[in-house]
């Protein structure tokens, strides 16, 4: 019946031995639904998003906002954008991504502000390029808020089910750039037997593809603790020619706060003046913040943990997937840093109305009894009770070099991948990919140009370019060190960089447009005032001496004075009444003052990075033919020919970033394709 429904020319699904075949009732789609059913459910959509995690939610919201009739299919409508691991958003580089998502009209920043219980700006002691916002969130409210957004988004419908295969047709276009063995997506099929037709499909399956959870020697199928697993999709995609791999991640035990002696722990408070993620004026900073707590492991704790190593699936060969380098389990840390007698643990609240705490730094798949015994030896945890143990999870992913920069697959037209299916880790990285996939799927259906962010435009651009150009051999997470143009990609200027693009796309609300125009106008207005204002030495020397810098010998422009270390606009307002009046009369808020100061102080560095970025962009303007036979170019090294043939870069700039392609290889391409 399913094969009849798939339609002429559609590919049959590959069979899998997992799970065993079982007889089950299915919803027949042989006859059209009744009039009553038609009112409740439409079976044809422009775009279908599979998966309701952080990537899926952003993808569905963006696609619908751009006018596509969109269906979001999720296994559990009670867990939209569920915080499966730590109850926090942001952090180093990740916070910049969230600000960029917000500037582009996404929802993650707004929902984080709405549900935050603590906010901190990390790396304040470093330069502004390193400042990274991070917020603890109320886990339950975060998911509930996403559900409210989705249920109130025009053009978006939701369906609770599990997709087990896709439906495709073989490409027959004689003028297509695609090879003859490639396909075009036509829809999805679910385990309930429903066939949904679609012009584009976005897969955001997270850790659910053949997910297998481990605690000690016990294992169970599932994409997350308490949830089911998705079978069939990996096997089906592989039957179309996709390459799949296996990765691993993990999560720590959840702690009952009532069993913890908090007097033995060191509280970690939020900022006194908390900022926020969203640039929208209606999005407010957190109030009534809740502290996190710092505690340390000991040598005794480590000895107990080592007792369980023989039963650890990480060390006994049970787990084959590759784990995240930068978020290791506690047993990984003990083996890698065997000389350390102590490791930091952070106890993070999961919400305002719960006693559940997340123990950051104690991710583990050791046996339950070992976890409990070790935790009871941590100071303040002597009487600890846990709600659930830590566990590791293995899942399938698809190497992202099989994607274009739009996140569309190279093998199947109008099929997009976003999130952990691409080998990334982290809510923020997933949400960014989902947003970009949703935008690009909509644009393609409207025959509009694709939306691709360059490496000098956004961390999102760095993220996607790294994925599709370099690929991954371990779960990928973003760091500021991955970006060549960190001074251009600051968290404070994400709106100035990206909101004009959101306006052009049609993703920016009227509130966002007005806020952007006001910020841009007032920032420049304040910079102009500072540039034009002359300051006499009698006005300023007292202030300069008070902060330990040399006094003026003659009058100077205020702009030049602000370039000095230790001088700030806030400090200058205490001695220059006209500057203070100008700021208040124009209703210039702290964020605009901060932005103006950064632009002035870092002007030289900003201009230098822009010059370098423009120079590198010339290589991005030299296009490479998608059907070019690199094996015929014998001047290239063998490794370069292999890598270029597999990845098929779109430009020489992209080719230059492929590992294994040398500067000499790039010179060969420049000569062949023309400088």
Name these PLM-found stretches.
Residues 42-55:
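Beta1/beta-strand and adjacent pyrophosphate-binding region of the FAD-binding site
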Residues 61-165, 169, 192, 204-224, ...:
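Conserved N-terminal/central alpha/beta ligand/cofactor-binding core
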Residues 76, 235-372, 464, 469-554, ...:
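An anion/pyrophosphate-binding glycine-rich loop and adjacent beta-alpha core
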Residues 482, 488, 499-667, 671-674:
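Extended, charge-enriched "interface" segments that sit outside catalytic cores
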């Amino acid at each position: 019946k399913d094969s009849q429904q798939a339609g002429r020319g559609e590919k049959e699904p590959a069979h899998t031995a997992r799970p065993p075949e079982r007889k089950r009732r299915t919803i027949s789609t042989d006859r059209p639904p009744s009039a009553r059913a038609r009112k409740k459910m439409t079976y044809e959509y422009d775009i279908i998003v599979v998966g309701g995690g952080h990537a899926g939610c952003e993808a569905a919201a963006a696609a619908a906002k751009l006018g596509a009739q969109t269906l979001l299919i999720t296994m559990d409508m009670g867990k939209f954008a569920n915080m499966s691991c730590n109850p926090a958003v942001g952090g180093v580089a990740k916070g910049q991504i969230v600000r960029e998502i917000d500037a582009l009209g996404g929802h993650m920043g707004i929902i984080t502000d709405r549900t935050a219980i603590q906010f901190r700006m990390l790396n304040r002691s470093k330069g502004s390029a390193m400042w990274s916002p991070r917020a603890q969130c109320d886990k339950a409210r975060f998911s509930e808020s996403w559900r409210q957004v989705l249920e109130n988004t025009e053009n978006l419908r939701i369906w609770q089910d599990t997709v087990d295969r896709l439906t495709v047709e073989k490409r027959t276009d004689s003028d297509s750039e695609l090879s003859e063995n490639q396909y075009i997506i036509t829809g999805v099929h679910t385990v309930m037997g429903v066939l949904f037709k679609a012009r584009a499909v976005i897969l955001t399956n997270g850790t659910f593809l053949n997910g297998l959870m481990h605690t000690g020697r016990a294992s169970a199928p599932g994409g997350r603790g308490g949830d089911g697993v998705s079978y069939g999709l990996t096997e089906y995609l592989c039957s179309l020619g996709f390459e799949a791999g296996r990765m691993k991640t993990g999560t720590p035990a959840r702690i009952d706060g009532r069993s913890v002696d908090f007097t033995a722990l060191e509280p970690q408070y939020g900022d006194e003046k908390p900022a926020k993620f969203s640039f929208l004026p209606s999005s407010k900073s957190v109030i009534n913040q809740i502290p996190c707590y710092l505690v340390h492991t000991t040598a005794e704790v480590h000895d107990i943990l080592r007792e369980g190593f023989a039963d650890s699936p990480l060390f006994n060969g049970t787990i084959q997937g590759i784990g995240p380098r930068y978020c290791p389990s506690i047993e990984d840390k003990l083996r890698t840093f065997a000389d350390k007698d102590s490791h930091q643990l952070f106890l993070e609240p999961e919400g305002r109305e719960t006693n559940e705490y997340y123990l950051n730094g104690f991710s583990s798949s050791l046996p339950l009894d070992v976890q409990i015994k070790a935790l009871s030896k941590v100071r303040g945890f002597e009487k600890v009770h846990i709600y659930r143990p830590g566990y590791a999870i293995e899942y399938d992913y698809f190497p992202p070099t099989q994607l274009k920069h739009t996140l569309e697959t190279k093998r199947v037209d109008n099929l997009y991948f976003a999130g952990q299916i691409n080998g990334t880790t982290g809510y923020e990285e997933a949400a960014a990919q989902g947003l970009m996939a949703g935008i690009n799927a909509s644009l393609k259906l409207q025959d509009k140009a694709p939306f691709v962010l360059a490496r000098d435009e956004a961390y999102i651009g760095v993220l996607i370019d790294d994925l599709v150009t370099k690929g991954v051999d371990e779960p990928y997470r973003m760091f500021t060190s991955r970006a060549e143009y960190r001074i251009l990609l600051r968290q404070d200027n994400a709106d100035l960089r990206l909101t004009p693009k959101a306006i052009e796309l049609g993703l920016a609300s009227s509130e966002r447009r007005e806020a952007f125009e006001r910020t841009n106008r007032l920032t420049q207005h304040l910079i102009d005032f500072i540039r034009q204002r002359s300051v006499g030495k009698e006005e300023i020397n007292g202030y300069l001496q008070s902060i330990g810098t040399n006094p003026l010998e003659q009058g100077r422009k205020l702009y030049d004075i602000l370039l000095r270390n230790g001088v700030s606009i806030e400090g200058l307002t205490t001695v220059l009444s006209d500057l203070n009046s100008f700021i208040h009369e124009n209703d210039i808020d702290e964020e605009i003052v901060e932005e103006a100061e950064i632009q002035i102080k870092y002007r030289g560095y900003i201009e230098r990075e822009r010059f370098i970025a423009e120079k590198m962009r010339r290589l991005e303007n030299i296009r490479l033919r998608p059907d070019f036979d690199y094996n015929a170019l014998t001047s290239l090294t063998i490794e370069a020919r292999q890598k270029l043939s597999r990845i098929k870069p779109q430009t020489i700039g992209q080719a230059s970033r492929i590992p294994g392609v040398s500067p000499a290889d790039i010179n060969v391409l420049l000569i062949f394709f023309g400088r």
